[in-house]
Amino acid sequence: MKKAPDFSLEDQNGNLKSLKDYAGKWIVMYFYPKDNTPGCTKEACNFRDAREQIEIITGAVVVGISKNSVASHKKFAEKHNLNFDLLSDPEHETISAYGAWGPKKFIGREFFGIHRNTYLISPEGEIVKEYLGVNPTTHAPQLIKDLAELAKK
């Protein structure tokens, strides 16, 4: 297991958050390309709907990170009643530190962007599981199964 990289990013309300703010809790940290796009909205709403179940199983918090602005995150969170922190990383430093920034292909075009990755971080700040290139529709249910397995240990 490797140590989760620390960060200092603003949430959708302009509050500065770091890894220490979530210390002692399991963290479901997911990286997504862009607010208010079909796949990202589906993923965020699935996490919203699963959050209570995620918290009951392990007490985990959900944190979403993209390079969108604080204002964009605020509108996105309000529009979809998102009940977790969305952190803004416009310079993609944290996104890069977690390995979620890199080359992508879309409609025959190559560019650099955010990979739809999720990291499960232990209360001790260790990355215990990586989900790379997740399917936004099926990801939350898989995560709940994995958290339930961890809770049994």
Predicted regions and their residues:
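Chalcogenol-based redox active-site neighborhoods
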Residues: 1-153
